[in-house]
Amino acid sequence: MYKQARPHQKRRKRSGAEVREEGLAAARGLLLDRGPAAVTLANVGQAIGMSHANVLHHFGSAAGLQSALMGSMVRDLTDALGNVVELMKTDAAAPRAVADRVFDAFDKGGAGPLAAWIILSGDVEQLDPVRAAVRALVEAIVGQSTDEAAPDRVRAAVLMMAVSAFGDAVIGPHVRDMLDQPDDAMRDLIARILPLFLIPTGIPPAAP
């Protein structure tokens, strides 16, 4: 006897761009609800009403899907930090707001566990889309400054924030507990350090 498909599984003709967009949205939902292990081609296909083979065609592999998701999350972070330099210069509360945006992306947004999953898989080539997104983030922030030394300082600031937010998302709760520190201890520390990167003499240049 014919059994009618459920509405969310109904298949329709979609462009490649639409499939990727819907697939990444579904992957993000799976990441937040069930963790990195749930971000598979089969689960995404089920969520968007496509076969495993069709999803495979658009993302190449489960690792490719996870990498594309990570890259899209970094691009979203770039958009969220669109006017960061001006804010930092005019708003005393901006450093903490910037820290919260970055840390939220790695923690509540799931980027921290996903990055750890990709790295521990050993397939580091899957970080290439992330590399492009991170460089775009640096360029977006550098583009807001007229200081010749801004590129070096921005790269250093992004390095500091990204590594700190990643570590805080993965192991931060346990380390904070060992040291009797509040939940926002690392965010507060980064917020206090971050303004130094806007001052030409705030951070000594790296040794040659």
Predicted features and spans:
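Hydrophobic alpha-helical connector segments
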Residues: 68, 79-112, 151-154
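Short, Lys/Arg-enriched anionic-surface-contact patches
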Residues: 11-19
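Helix-turn-helix
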Residues: 19-22, 26, 30-64, 68
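Phosphate/oxyanion-binding loops and surfaces in catalytic or ligand/nucleic-acid-binding neighborhoods
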Residues: 72, 76, 105, 109, ...
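Amphipathic alpha-helical packing segments from all-alpha helical-bundle domains
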Residues: 77-81, 122-146, 152-159, 188-191
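Short alpha-helical scaffolding segments that buttress acidic/His motifs in well-ordered protein cores
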Residues: 102, 115-119, 158-161, 165
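C-terminal peripheral helix-coil segments that are non-catalytic and often amphipathic
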Residues: 1-7, 104, 136-147, 167-208
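Amphipathic alpha-helical segments used for helix-helix packing
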Residues: 104-132, 173-175
